[in-house]
Amino acid sequence: MTQVAKKILVTCALPYANGSIHLGHMLEHIQADVWVRYQRMRGHEVNFICADDAHGTPIMLKAQQLGITPEQMIGEMSQEHQTDFAGFNISYDNYHSTHSDENRELSELIYTRLKENGFIKNRTISQLYDPEKGMFLPDRFVKGTCPKCKSADQYGDNCEVCGATYSPTELIEPKSVVSGATPVMRDSEHFFFDLPSFSEMLQAWTRSGALQEQVANKMQEWFESGLQQWDISRDAPYFGFEIPNAPGKYFYVWLDAPIGYMGSFKNLCDKRGDTTSFDEYWKKDSDAELYHFIGKDIVYFHSLFWPAMLEGSHFRKPTNLFVHGYVTVNGAKMSKSRGTFIKASTWLKHFDADSLRYYYTAKLSSRIDDIDLNLEDFVQRVNADIVNKVVNLASRNAGFINKRFDGVLAAELADPQLYKTFTDAAAVIGEAWESREFGKAIREIMALADIANRYVDEQAPWVVAKQEGRDADLQAICSMGINLFRVLMTYLKPVLPTLSERVEAFLNSELNWDAIEQPLLGHKVNTFKALYNRIDMKQVEALVESSKEEVKAAAAPVTGPLADFPIQETITFDDFAKIDLRVALIENAEFVDGSDKLLRLTLDLGGEKRNVFSGIRSAYPDPQALIGRQTVMVANLAPRKMRFGVSEGMVMAAGPGGKDIFLLSPDDGAKPGQQVK
């Protein structure tokens, strides 16, 4: 049964680093993990990697909203994402970030090669600009009506209804997502990837037969409508990698995001001290296999742009794309108000990971069909299949083996032909796992479980146990049941890793695909302990209620200094150097007639006197208390004429205003007139 070992690199689409993992994400990661675990069981060398997609304006703006830096936000998100995936036993060899040195180097390398090969074009474009926020609007921050299918409320780069891609300027009735303002047009020089140059190569790849039929058909539609050059640059302000030799221009997030697959693998190789595998897997003539598990909403990027970028920069193309559909809950789109928009972490507070892994697996196929998580059906199916059919098979037999035979199984099989029926099914079940026909694999396994339970029903060990002189029969029957259980759990091991660990502990034997040909005979098992508990609708109700409460909590406004007053746009060192900050001694402080906000300060700069009006009266109702205190002032601010006189600078203070204003003071020892650097 052993196959020739293959070298396989598997990826999942990179989760965006501005939000939590939810059950929609988990479909893909579970699907990929089941496939990867099966490949590993068959002896293949599998590298399973992922990363956070950590760039783009949405992350920059979300960080501002939270009052933290983008780097801090993506760091916290990465930890949260990795915790969630570990909780669902997603067996990644490496989880990285697109905001990494490896990804920067590879993005610059691929861009440079594309440019050297003539595939990067420059031209000035008219771009949507938010006049209220003073920024160019990235694709995802413009919404309007799709120019192709006329669906409303679609983003500026692609339509989630028909899958079309387009320029934000093509949207009908566009609006800024940031401010709600109607964008205006402004010119900007942008860089374009010449996708049409790869049309012939992409069509040949499509016709190769490797892609899912639905994907190939969709690509053919795109070819017929004509491929367009792809805008790969964005203007500052932008959180990402600056394009080499192009100040103020950044790589569009969708350029460096798929390169993140390469970056994560490079990071893994470096961790291992492996200097050869990266080139071995990614060189143009590599014989390693590369598979991307993705959702149907990002097929365009992975089936057109990504292979074309790789081809144009002399790297290998993917072996295949494995595309899945969306997740609905109880027959409808996931809803925050109904409590069906469920985060991965919330699920794990109410159910184990194996339960969702099993339910998704039972519904998955190689097609791009949506999967419905019907919560009532979920409870019934987990109890009927995992508990009643599989685990119950072990519990019905293990007690007799433990109590009557000291845990030792019979030396011979009671029904070798029946056992062969189970092991012969390995070919069909293995092919179903291989071809991602997961639902078929589960149906085959559950059909065998029915046969195994029927065998136990017919042999009735509970009756035999009461009959004198039939100990050997009892041991043989129960040993047969446990061996059939072992085969079933071997087939289910890619799906149920936690349960499999418990089963291996009970059997005192690893669940190994190639070992099922040899049954456990004369083998001592350990004391049987409950392997899996039934679930009920009360847990579902608690899950839904928890999700609703989390939505309410998340809707509470974020407060704090950075949230209330976000950090301003970045300035250069030269800009900062223009500001001349000096230590100043407050010689006098007094109220200003006609103003309930200002104090008049007389400042000594160590040989020069300044008159400054400062709006700090609400925090310092007794101005005399300021006399003799040192502070910091902007000494080279242009004088400002006011109706009370001329203000010759500005003193520095912190706080939101009102009584919460705090005049800055240097440490003891500072002298009036000294420069603050």
Swiss-Prot record:
It is found in: Cytoplasm. ATP binds at residue 336. Its EC number is 6.1.1.10. A motif ('HIGH' region) lies at residues 15-25. One of its GO terms (biological process) is methionyl-tRNA aminoacylation. Pfam families: Anticodon_3 (PF19303), tRNA-synt_1g (PF09334), tRNA_bind (PF01588). It comes from the Bacteria. Keywords: Aminoacyl-tRNA synthetase, ATP-binding, Cytoplasm, Ligase, Metal-binding, Nucleotide-binding, Protein biosynthesis, RNA-binding, tRNA-binding, Zinc. A motif ('KMSKS' region) lies at residues 333-337. It catalyses: tRNA(Met) + L-methionine + ATP = L-methionyl-tRNA(Met) + AMP + diphosphate. Its cofactor is Zn(2+). Residues 575-677 form the tRNA-binding domain. One of its GO terms (molecular function) is methionine-tRNA ligase activity. The keyword DNA-binding does not apply. Transmembrane segments: none annotated. Zn(2+) binds at residues 146, 149, 159, 162. Binds 1 zinc ion per subunit. Homodimer. Belongs to the class-I aminoacyl-tRNA synthetase family. MetG type 1 subfamily. Is required not only for elongation of protein synthesis but also for the initiation of all mRNA translation through initiator tRNA(fMet) aminoacylation. This is Methionine--tRNA ligase. The lineage of its organism: Bacteria, Pseudomonadati, Pseudomonadota, Gammaproteobacteria, Enterobacterales. The gene is metG.
